[in-house]
C-alpha cells in the first residue's frame, strides 16, 4: 500500500513538474506567430490587414479548424480585412468573444534603431512595431486557440476570435463593422480585449494587474487659420501660421479641469499604497476633499497620472503654406483629445474654442467614420462600466494569483481608447486585460523602438492560455 501511495505521489509530482516546465518553457509557435505578424506591415498608409488576417487564418486551418469556422471578411476596402475564427464548445454557455486589432500606427525606419517591421530580439527584448500595441495580444490569442484545438479541449462555450482593422484610425473599423454587418458571427455573452489593461512592472517585476473598468472617449479636431496670403517679400500684420501657432500655444499651457470618478478614485487609492512615500503623499492629498491643487500639479507632471486626472488634448499634426516664397493662405493642425467619462466630443469642442480664443479660426470635429470634418461633434459620452462577471473575476484571480502571487488586480480607466467602445455600444459588455508585463517607465505604444521583454511575452502566452481554459471549464 505504501509503495502504491508513493508511486501515486510520484506521478502527481511528475505531472505538476511537467506542467510547470511546459508553462515556463518558451512557446516556439507563439513566438513564430508573433514574428510573422510583426513582419507584415499593417500600418494605415501602406499596410494591409487582409494579408495578416489571411496568415492567421492559414495557421488556424493548418491546426485543424474547420473552414466554416475561419473566415476573412472585408468591407469596402479590400486591404482592411478582418479574421473571425471560432473554437467550438459544448454550448453550455453563450460564447465569449476575444477582440484584437491587426493594424498598427505608422513607423519610420529613420526614427528607429532597428527596422520597425523586422522582428528583432536584442538584449532580452523583442523590437518591432506592434510589440506592445498589440500584435503580442493577437499572436497570444491565436496560439492559445491552436493549443486548445490540438489538445482536443472542448470549452463549455464557443470561443470566438476577431482580429480586425482600423482600430488605430481610418474609416473601416473592423469591430464596428462586424457588429453592424456580421453580428451572427461575433455574437457573444461578453467580450475580452487584450488591448486594454496591463500587468505593470518595475524592472521586469510585476507590481499591479490592471483590469479595464471604463475608458476615455477618442476625438480628433481640426483647427484651421486662413489668410489672403501674398508675396513673402511683403509680410502682412496677420499670418495664418502665426495665428495657428498662437492658438496651439494657448492649448499647450491649458490643463483641463481635474476630475475623479469612482474607477479612477479606486485606482488612486491602490496606487497610494504602492508608490514611494513622496508620491503616495501627493496621491492621498489629491484624494482629499477638497483636493490639494499643488499635489494635483505635481502628479500631473507624470503623463500616466495626468491622463488619469483629466481630459487631455494635444496637437498631433501640422500642415501649412503652399510655397516657400509665398505668405501662407492656410495653416491647419489636428488636435487629438481623450475625453473623461461624463463629457462629450461636442462639449470639448466648445472648450477648445474658448481656449484658442480666436473667432477667426475654424474649429471642427473630425468624423472618424468618414475622416471628414464636421462643424459640431456628437453628444455621445463614454459608456458606463460593464457589470462585474463573477466567473471572469474568479478565473483572473486564480490564474494571476498563481503566476504573480501577491500582485493585486486593480480596476482602471483606460486613458486611451479601445474597440471595447464598439462592443459596448452594441450591447455587449467588454473587459480589458492583458497578461504581458510592461515596465511603467518603458511604455512605448506608438513610439520609436517599441519593444517588449522576451520574458514578459512568454509569461503572457502562458497566462492567456490558462485563463481561457479556466474561464471555459478547463
Please annotate each region the language model reported:
Residues 20, 197-207, 211-459, 465, ...:
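Metal-dependent amide/peptide-bond hydrolase catalytic core
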Amino acid at each position: 500500500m505504501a509503495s502504491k501511495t508513493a508511486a501515486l505521489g510520484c506521478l502527481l509530482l511528475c505531472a505538476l513538474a511537467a506542467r510547470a516546465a511546459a508553462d515556463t518553457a518558451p512557446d516556439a509557435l507563439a513566438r513564430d506567430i508573433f514574428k510573422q505578424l510583426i513582419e507584415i506591415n499593417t500600418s494605415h498608409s501602406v499596410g494591409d490587414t487582409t494579408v495578416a488576417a489571411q496568415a492567421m487564418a492559414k495557421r488556424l486551418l493548418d491546426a485543424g479548424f474547420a473552414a466554416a469556422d475561419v473566415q476573412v471578411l472585408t468591407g469596402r476596402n479590400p486591404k482592411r480585412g478582418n479574421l473571425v475564427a471560432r473554437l467550438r464548445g459544448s454550448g453550455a454557455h453563450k460564447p465569449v468573444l476575444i477582440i484584437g486589432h491587426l493594424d498598427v500606427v505608422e513607423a519610420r525606419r529613420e526614427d528607429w534603431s532597428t527596422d520597425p517591421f523586422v522582428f528583432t530580439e536584442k538584449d532580452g527584448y523583442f523590437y518591432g512595431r506592434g510589440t506592445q500595441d498589440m500584435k503580442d495580444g493577437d499572436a497570444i490569442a491565436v496560439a492559445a486557440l491552436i493549443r486548445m484545438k490540438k489538445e482536443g479541449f472542448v470549452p463549455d462555450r464557443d470561443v470566438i476570435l476577431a482580429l480586425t482593422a482600423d482600430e488605430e484610425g481610418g474609416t473601416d473599423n473592423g469591430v464596428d463593422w462586424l457588429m453592424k454587418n456580421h453580428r451572427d458571427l461575433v455574437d457573444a455573452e461578453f467580450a475580452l480585449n487584450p488591448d486594454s489593461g496591463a500587468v505593470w512592472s518595475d524592472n521586469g517585476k510585476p507590481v499591479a494587474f490592471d483590469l479595464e473598468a471604463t475608458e476615455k472617449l477618442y476625438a480628433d479636431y481640426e483647427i484651421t487659420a486662413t489668410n489672403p496670403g501674398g508675396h513673402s517679400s511683403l509680410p502682412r500684420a496677420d499670418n495664418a501660421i502665426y495665428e495657428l501657432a498662437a492658438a496651439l500655444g494657448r492649448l499647450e499651457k491649458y490643463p483641463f479641469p481635474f476630475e475623479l470618478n469612482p474607477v479612477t478614485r479606486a485606482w488612486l487609492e491602490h496606487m497610494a499604497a504602492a508608490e514611494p512615500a513622496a508620491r503616495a503623499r501627493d496621491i492621498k492629498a489629491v484624494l482629499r476633499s477638497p483636493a490639494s491643487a499643488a499635489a494635483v500639479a505635481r502628479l500631473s507632471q507624470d503623463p500616466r497620472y495626468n491622463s488619469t486626472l483629466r481630459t487631455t488634448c494635444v496637437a498631433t499634426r501640422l500642415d501649412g503654406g503652399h510655397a516657400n516664397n509665398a505668405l501662407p493662405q492656410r495653416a491647419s493642425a489636428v488636435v487629438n483629445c481623450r475625453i473623461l467619462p461624463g463629457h462629450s466630443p461636442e462639449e470639448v469642442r466648445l472648450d477648445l474654442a474658448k481656449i484658442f480664443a480666436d473667432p477667426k479660426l475654424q474649429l471642427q470635429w473630425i468624423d472618424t467614420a468618414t475622416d471628414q470634418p464636421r462643424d459640431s461633434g456628437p453628444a455621445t459620452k463614454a459608456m458606463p462600466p460593464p457589470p462585474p462577471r463573477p466567473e471572469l473575476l474568479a478565473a483572473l484571480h486564480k490564474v494571476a494569483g498563481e503566476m504573480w502571487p501577491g500582485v493585486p488586480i486593480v480596476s482602471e480607466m483606460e486613458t486611451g481608447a479601445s474597440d471595447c467602445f464598439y462592443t459596448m455600444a452594441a450591447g455587449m459588455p467588454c473587459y480589458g486585460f492583458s497578461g504581458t508585463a510592461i515596465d511603467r517607465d518603458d511604455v512605448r505604444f506608438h513610439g520609436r523602438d517599441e519593444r517588449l521583454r522576451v520574458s514578459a511575452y512568454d509569461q503572457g502566452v502562458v497566462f492567456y492560455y490558462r485563463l481561457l481554459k479556466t474561464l471555459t471549464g478547463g
